From Swiss-Prot, chain A:
<dbReference type="GO" id="GO:0005730">
    <property type="term" value="C:nucleolus"/>
</dbReference>
<dbReference type="GO" id="GO:0000175">
    <property type="term" value="F:3'-5'-RNA exonuclease activity"/>
</dbReference>
<dbReference type="GO" id="GO:0101019">
    <property type="term" value="C:nucleolar exosome (RNase complex)"/>
</dbReference>
<dbReference type="GO" id="GO:0005829">
    <property type="term" value="C:cytosol"/>
</dbReference>
<dbReference type="GO" id="GO:0000176">
    <property type="term" value="C:nuclear exosome (RNase complex)"/>
</dbReference>
<dbReference type="GO" id="GO:0005654">
    <property type="term" value="C:nucleoplasm"/>
</dbReference>
<keyword id="KW-0007">Acetylation</keyword>
<dbReference type="GO" id="GO:0045006">
    <property type="term" value="P:DNA deamination"/>
</dbReference>
<dbReference type="GO" id="GO:0071038">
    <property type="term" value="P:TRAMP-dependent tRNA surveillance pathway"/>
</dbReference>
<comment type="function">
    <text>Non-catalytic component of the RNA exosome complex which has 3'-&gt;5' exoribonuclease activity and participates in a multitude of cellular RNA processing and degradation events. In the nucleus, the RNA exosome complex is involved in proper maturation of stable RNA species such as rRNA, snRNA and snoRNA, in the elimination of RNA processing by-products and non-coding 'pervasive' transcripts, such as antisense RNA species and promoter-upstream transcripts (PROMPTs), and of mRNAs with processing defects, thereby limiting or excluding their export to the cytoplasm.</text>
</comment>
<keyword id="KW-1017">Isopeptide bond</keyword>
<keyword id="KW-0271">Exosome</keyword>
<dbReference type="GO" id="GO:0071034">
    <property type="term" value="P:CUT catabolic process"/>
</dbReference>
<feature type="modified residue" description="N-acetylalanine">
    <location>
        <position position="2"/>
    </location>
</feature>
<dbReference type="GO" id="GO:0000791">
    <property type="term" value="C:euchromatin"/>
</dbReference>
<dbReference type="Pfam" id="PF21262">
    <property type="entry name" value="RRP40_S1"/>
</dbReference>
<feature type="cross-link" description="Glycyl lysine isopeptide (Lys-Gly) (interchain with G-Cter in SUMO2)">
    <location>
        <position position="151"/>
    </location>
</feature>
Length: 275, 449
């Protein structure tokens, strides 16, 4: 009842905020305001709706909704800051209204705390390495942030090496800082990436797609031949296979995956498997 | 923004791939990327796409007074700009070196070769001549700016039409395009630059390097030629030593390439001319497909996938049995397990012992030799396949390491790192006592052989 009313009111008023639930999966543009579920009822036709006062504290039940990338809180509503599709994830357990975010596509990376990225060491100055991660500033990496590193036992890192690490500090006011150990002090796969192999760059959306838990592409690629892959959230992928030919094929497949439908992809994989 | 640095592993990979005659996008050594030429609505405006490298060329003209020492010749002015959208490294004040080099090359290629008849640009001797200005803008940088820019310049010049002028005595009449059709420029020939990138001190060469290849190249040779096989400009940069026959070979290749590109240019100009004459729609808007999303389109890369499986089989056959992708951990000693292949062994020549070993873990065979000293006892104890066999079969068995300094060390390949042996020795010290005996036993066997 509230939705058609609000839609009608929207056409009358012009720039009325839309309900987030109705826009799920559709393209939203920056500047749009979205209403959260419990606000829809409040914003009925005209705005002033009379509701019976209730003495129960339950009346003002607020649901905790998490604002993901591409959205910003603006008063009681959500303001869209990136263009893309609106997505929502139900809360796994307990209370909370879930997460809303905008699925957008871009190539330029902005450091985010907790992201695992591949960086290139550009300079060694005293106790820290300067690592280029594709952002506006090089990240700093202390030599003590490697597993088993002490003041006497320094890690063997040269300028030009590839590093897989995660950000501990990444905001717009400071230069980002990264480490190659997790909170327990273990490397957990991070550190210097081996000598051979090929590094190439793709869009950020493709990386997120490939890192999704149920990604078919990686499983299919793994069936072709033995390989090693490292994905960095900054759009960089490092691959290594037994021969250069195989590595090149891998790199081209992954780059092309972005532009292929799943049928085309299956075709290519079957052709590779039988050749 | 600073340019993204080139990592060591990328450089190594690219050089190794070039040694095996493989390029990143599957091209052959002498192949050019796809060239696409599109024209704008105005005469003299064109965009040339060489793979992903894009250059926009625009020609304009103006009536000015001539230079004092060249009273009867028109003026040509070339300008190449590296737009900030071409690459993150291009900033307003930054790219001076590259810019100067490219501009000089463009000028030498087009001005000094006299491809345009400047005498025909004269209107009134000593008073009025045409000044032709060619502006080139680099829209996207994916390697080989020079070639794309030279093609864009010559296409724009061929496409351009200047207003018609008539001189009657002292009267000069300049006609607008509506009064009289504009007149094309008088172009003698079409010089086109072809770039050759050299790697490993001139051993390997590639035509039309893309951005990654340009980063790792040693030197660059640019030959500007026209279809009559006349060399207009030749420039070698990077300080590499080139042999005479290399340069001659490059010029032959350039001749072939220039002929192809000139054909492409003439065809494109002809098509555009036809469309304009027939009154059809032309311009950049028309060259973009309608009602289709082209942002998610990528050209097919001609990667050779034919012998992938053969090579894989060769590798597998050499290291029998075929290794599983996910291997189970191998327990060497309580507390030490191994998963996977490990790093490459640098102890000695292993290929002989591998080939003779008909059974036994393929991967494990390599590691067995690598840590044979540490696990000398354990190998025979566990009875892992083919452990002790190695010593019998391998006529040139790899280095036998002894952990006691008193026994003489027989090093089969003295030039391989002696340092490594030392560190291994120290780590094997704990097993000094038990492993002494088997060592002695083995030595006796060899003496018998």
């Amino acid at each position: 009842m509230a939705e058609p009313a609000s839609v009608a009111a929207e056409s009358l008023a012009g720039s009325r905020a839309r309900a987030a639930r109705t826009v799920l999966g559709q393209v939203v543009l920056p500047g749009e305001e979205l209403l959260l579920p419990e606000q829809e009822d409040a914003e009925g036709p005209g705005g002033a709706v009379e509701r019976p006062l209730s003495l129960n504290a339950r009346a003002c039940s607020r649901v905790r909704v998490v604002c993901g990338p591409g959205l910003r809180r603006c008063g009681d509503r959500l303001l869209v800051t990136k263009c893309g599709r609106l997505r929502h994830k139900e809360p796994g357990s307990g209370s909370g209204g879930g997460v809303y975010w905008v699925d957008s596509q871009q190539k330029r990376y902005v450091p985010v705390k907790g992201d695992h990225v591949i960086g290139i060491v550009t300079a060694k100055s005293g106790d820290i390495f300067k690592v280029d991660v594709g952002g506006s500033e090089p990240a700093s990496l202390s030599y003590l942030s490697f597993e088993g590193a002490t003041k006497r036992n320094r890690p063997n890192v040269q300028v030009g090496d590839l590093i897989y690490g995660q950000f501990v500090v990444a905001n717009k006011d400071m230069e980002p800082e990264m480490v190659c150990i997790d909170s327990c002090g273990r490397a957990n796969g991070m550190g210097v990436i081996g000598q051979d192999g090929l590094l190439f760059k793709v869009t950020l959306g493709l990386i997120r797609k490939l890192l999704a838990p149920d990604c078919e592409i990686i499983q299919e690629v793994g069936k072709l031949y033995p390989l090693e892959i490292v994905f960095g959230m900054n759009g960089r992928i490092w691959v290594k296979a037994k021969t250069i030919q195989q590595t090149l094929i891998l790199a081209n497949i992954l780059e092309a995956c972005e532009h292929m439908t799943s049928d085309q992809r299956k075709q290519i994989f079957s052709r590779l498997a039988e050749s | 923004m600073k340019e993204t640095p080139l990592s060591n592993c990328e450089r190594r990979f690219l050089l190794r791939a070039i040694e095996e005659k493989k390029r990143l996008d599957g091209r052959q050594t002498y192949d050019y990327r796809n060239i696409r030429i599109s024209f704008g609505t105005d005469y003299g405006c064109c965009i040339v796409e060489l793979g992903k490298t894009r250059v926009l060329g625009q020609v304009s003209c103006e009536l000015v007074s001539p230079k004092l020492n060249r009273a009867t010749e028109g003026i040509l002015f070339f300008n190449l700009e590296l737009s900030q959208m071409a690459a993150p490294a291009f900033e307003p004040g930054r790219q001076s070196d590259l810019l100067v080099k490219l501009n000089r090359l463009m000028e030498r290629c087009l001005r000094n070769s006299k491809c345009i008849d400047t005498e025909s640009l004269c209107v009134v001797a000593g008073e009025k001549v045409w000044q032709i200005r060619v502006d080139l803008h680099l829209l996207n940088h994916d390697g080989n700016i020079i070639d794309a820019a030279s093609i864009a310049a010559i296409v724009a010049l061929c496409h351009f039409r200047r207003p018609d002028v008539s001189v009657q005595g002292d009267e000069v009449t300049l006609y607008t395009p509506e009064e009289r059709d504009p007149v094309p420029l008088s172009i003698h020939h079409m010089p086109i630059c072809v770039s050759f990138a050299f790697f490993q001190q001139g051993t390997y060469l590639l035509v039309d390097p893309n951005e990654r290849e340009e980063r790792v190249m040693d030197g660059l040779l640019v030959i500007a030629m026209n279809k009559h096989r006349e060399i207009c400009t030749i420039q070698s940069s990077g300080g590499i030593m080139l042999l005479k026959d290399q340069v001659l070979r490059c010029s032959k290749i350039a001749g072939v390439k220039v002929a192809e590109i000139t054909e492409l240019i003439l065809k494109a100009l002809e098509n555009d001319q036809k469309v304009r004459k027939e009154g059809g729609k032309f311009g950049f808007a028309e060259s973009i497909a309608n009602q289709r999303i082209t942002a998610f389109k990528m050209e097919k890369a001609p990667i050779d996938t034919s012998d992938v499986e053969e090579k894989a089989e060769e590798i597998i056959a050499e290291a029998e049995p075929p290794s599983e992708v996910v291997s189970t951990p191998v327990l060497w000693t309580p507390g030490t397990a191994q998963i996977g292949e490990g790093v490459e062994n640098s102890w000695g020549d292993l290929e002989d012992s591998e080939k003779e070993d008909d059974e036994g873990g393929g991967d494990q065979a390599i590691i067995l030799d690598g840590i044979k000293m540490d696990t000398g006892v354990e190998v025979s104890d566990i009875g892992s396949q083919g452990g002790p066999k190695h010593w019998k079969n391998g006529a040139d068995a790899p280095i036998i390491l002894s952990d006691s300094e008193e026994e003489e060390m027989i090093i089969l390949e003295p030039d391989k790192n002696p340092k490594k042996i030392r560190t291994q020795t120290t780590s094997a010290k704990q097993e000094k006592a038990p492993s002494k005996k088997p060592v002695k036993r083995r030595k006796k066997k060899r003496a018998a052989n």
